Amino acid sequence: EITVEPVRHPKKDPSEAE
C-alpha cells in the first residue's frame, strides 16, 4: 500500500532520490 513513501522520494524527481 502507498502512504507517504512516494511523497518522500518521488521517482519523477531524481534530485530527491538518494
Swiss-Prot record:
Tissue expression as described in the entry: Expressed by the venom gland.
Record's subcellular location: Secreted
Chief place of localization: secreted
One term of GO molecular function: toxin activity
Keywords: Neurotoxin, Secreted, Toxin
Cellular component GO terms held in the UniProt record: extracellular region
Family: Belongs to the scolopendra toxin 6 family.
Name of the protein: Scolopendra 5971.33 Da toxin
